Amino acid sequence: MGLVEFHSGAIDESIQHYQRAVSLEPRSYSGHYDLALAYLKAHKLEEARTQLELAVSLDPRRADAAYDLGVLLLEMGDPSAALIKLRQARALDPQRADVSFNIVRAQLESGRVNEARTEARESAKRFGSDFQWNAAVGQLFLEKGQAKDAVPYLLQASRVRPEDTEIRHQLALAYLESGQANEVLDTIPTAETSDDHYMRASAYYIAHRFPEADQESQLALAMAPENPAILILRTRLLQRAGEQDDALVMAQKAITLAPNWDEPYYLAGVSYYFIRRYEQAEASLARAVELNPKSARALFLESIALANLGKVEDAERCLRQAIRLQPGDARLHCHLGILLARKNESGAAEDSFRKAIQLKPDYGLAHYELGKLLVGSQQLRPAAQELELAVKDDPGLTAAYYQLARVYTKLGEKEKSQQALAEFERLYQQEAHDSRAVDQALDDDARRATELR
């Protein structure tokens, strides 16, 4: 009776019948298993878990109960426990593609990325011709931020069903997110839809083929003028072209269409920053961080905007938060050093500059800032060495030549001083105040950070 009511949609009544059945036969595998399915249908997950655990304990040779319990544990946020049950189900029935898929899923959700890669690779030997398995595993890797791992499975799915447009687009997206621009263009050789144009434009963008990216993105926007992703790409292209006002228009439209997406707020903050509207930049970037607290790039640029507003303590807080998120980013350590130097915390600033150089030995700005700091403490020879490295690593760092000329003068190396000053004047083509040159160097460094996608 419970089964009839279950299939007729009378879930509450079927639960009552199954409850009576298991009270009469408490050791009935099918009774507990069917009651679990009814609880699942009613979204009563804890009750379903209890019944599935009873079913598994009553008959550990049944793959269905072990599998369903594993999937339920995944849904309840316990991937490690789910993995045990899913492996149990596979041992009982190794031919099930759904079990293989969910093992990979459990491994990814528990942070065992290498195990997931191995599992998928081994399972492909058995399910490699299965379209659904390949498509599902590829999409799973893509959703979990492992685009490069998604490629072989989506590629195989596309080979099995070359006419499947959705899989072709998923494959193109995996190529795009793993930085394989040429493969995107090969996957979508001609554009018929706005998505096609967007994918091709994005591929040209990451390949630094900006004229083609501009053309394709305009075609995409003409076909889908209210697509936030296309608007964001147009914003980036306009920013690279220095058209910050037009970029802001695009970013603001994207904000209207996707108010809970951090990206348009971040890009609006970028444009506000480069047109020196620091208060608006800080507000927009703060909103981006609110929506995505793990956005180190938004925290970085927010810190620079705050510093320009004279809010050094708030700027330092943002930078330290960014460093906690990305401790291996040399730029963050360098700019923290700049802030600390402004606060006259020379020892801590020096530590930050040296950390930046350790992470990125050819980072010209870090060498420059360290050299300038050493000048202040009269360590002239080490300062000269750092400034020499600065101009070697970044020949366009004009302020470094100015500082180097001053240091050489103090060291009594007149010829070297004249050469450094001549190079400074050649780059500037006129006398320039050191602080203005430094501001330009910081702006250039910030711009490079915004261009890292």
Annotate each PLM feature.
Residues H7-R20, K41-L54, E75-Q88, E109-E122, ...:
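Structural signature of tandem alpha-helical TPR/SEL1-like repeats
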Residues L24, L58, L92, K125-F127, ...:
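Structural marker of alpha-solenoid helical repeat scaffolds
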Residues L176, E192-T193, K392-D394, T398-H433:
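TPR/TPR-like (Sel1-like) alpha-helical repeat modules
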